Amino acid sequence: MKKIRCALIGSGNIGTDLIYKIRRSALLEPVWMVGIDPASEGLARARELGLKTTAEGVDGLLPHVQEDDIQIAFDATSAYVHAENSRKLNALGVLVIDLTPAAIGPLCVPPVNLREHAARLEMNVNMISCAGQATIPVVHAVSRIQSVAYAEIVASLASKSIGPGTRANLDEFTYTTSGALEKVGGARRGKALAIINPAEPPMIMRNTISCLTDAEPDQERLSASILQMVGEVQKYVPGYRLVNGPLYDGNGVSVFMEVAGLGDYLPTYAGNLDIMTAAATRTAEMFAEEILAGKIRLPTPEVA
């Protein structure tokens, strides 16, 4: 079966984990890994796995996009450089999945709104953040039943799972995730908080989700909606688990989740990596299905 050929931009934790997710896909093939440090472990591992590599950033990939038929690129670099990366790749007809908090394209959470993005050709979609992918489905599960005045999420992440790129983008991480709780989750106001936990041994990713509904919670319908949504996420993130809840207190609804990874690149405590890379892979697969079926066509680049 024909596969859509992909490039991975960024050779850090997220980019390296993506290699394994995409290699398992029936629809996607990883072909290029792009970095900026010739000595990076991610580039070395990519070469071992048979990918072509460059340490010259996106500019090192551009001359090879057409000859290697790259149609989808995953950008796992930084919010600060994403817009320029995306502009250069889009100009060559490459669809970009954005794993930075840049959020220049529409925000995507697979079980909430992926199908609508795939149905129309978006050349850049943003995966928000690991915390967003872990918590927005639950907020949406509440807001589709009852209006939510306020949603607050707290993500606790093992320090060892947070690379320099994510650390440099923590402000953008908070801002983008807070906004996505509103735009995608459906809350009128959203607030996202991240705790980077240096404990040894490293702790699994944990998420606390609190919603304040306008009316008294319809506990039976809300619980059913939340459990259904947890099942949807588990289809592509098997380690996504409801630990406690939903708990009800007045108009408050609280849910406690944890996310274990598959252990592809970092150990299983790094569920924050897995939920981000799995969501991005699922998103790319949906676009790949549409491309392979001829339902959407990527633009043909103009040859100078």
From Swiss-Prot:
<feature type="binding site">
    <location>
        <position position="272"/>
    </location>
    <ligand>
        <name>NAD(+)</name>
    </ligand>
</feature>
<feature type="binding site">
    <location>
        <begin position="161"/>
        <end position="169"/>
    </location>
    <ligand>
        <name>NAD(+)</name>
    </ligand>
</feature>
<dbReference type="Pfam" id="PF09290">
    <property type="entry name" value="AcetDehyd-dimer"/>
</dbReference>
<comment type="similarity">
    <text>Belongs to the acetaldehyde dehydrogenase family.</text>
</comment>
<keyword id="KW-0520">NAD</keyword>
<dbReference type="GO" id="GO:0051287">
    <property type="term" value="F:NAD binding"/>
</dbReference>
<dbReference type="InterPro" id="IPR036291">
    <property type="entry name" value="NAD(P)-bd_dom_sf"/>
</dbReference>
<dbReference type="InterPro" id="IPR000534">
    <property type="entry name" value="Semialdehyde_DH_NAD-bd"/>
</dbReference>
<dbReference type="GO" id="GO:0008774">
    <property type="term" value="F:acetaldehyde dehydrogenase (acetylating) activity"/>
</dbReference>
<protein>
    <recommendedName>
        <fullName>Acetaldehyde dehydrogenase 3</fullName>
        <ecNumber>1.2.1.10</ecNumber>
    </recommendedName>
</protein>
<dbReference type="InterPro" id="IPR015426">
    <property type="entry name" value="Acetylaldehyde_DH_C"/>
</dbReference>
<dbReference type="InterPro" id="IPR003361">
    <property type="entry name" value="Acetaldehyde_dehydrogenase"/>
</dbReference>
<feature type="binding site">
    <location>
        <begin position="11"/>
        <end position="14"/>
    </location>
    <ligand>
        <name>NAD(+)</name>
    </ligand>
</feature>
<keyword id="KW-0560">Oxidoreductase</keyword>
<dbReference type="GO" id="GO:0009056">
    <property type="term" value="P:catabolic process"/>
</dbReference>
<keyword id="KW-0058">Aromatic hydrocarbons catabolism</keyword>
<feature type="active site" description="Acyl-thioester intermediate">
    <location>
        <position position="130"/>
    </location>
</feature>
